[in-house]
């Protein structure tokens, strides 16, 4: 993994479990969000199995949450609760319907200390089509996009910052 914006380079060995109710697109959006924010202490949580936790977070030894990352289209109430519990909150939406979600919640999100990004939904689908049970992939992040190369193909996934704090 190479993040040219942050000068962050790492070889990550990740095991990602797909929840039975989780789409492949969501799982891959979650992987992208992880890579975009990769740093020491960043871990996947129980995800959809635990509504009290985000998809990804950083917690300190005293169990304080310094970074809370949700993937999808969480309700404004969930984001508000997260912003009270964590030092920094980020949301990555990825669905084709995320435009509607953003327009409906925009005014409520505007008053919260949260950064919101929207992945290009078609690019996420293209990335999902490359998934294999066991795979090696290379991710290079520059600006607001990630170039992904796998044994079965390559693609680029871009994202748009909707609100950055």
Regions found by a protein language model. Name each.
Residues 46-52, 57-61:
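Long amphipathic N-terminal alpha/beta scaffold segment
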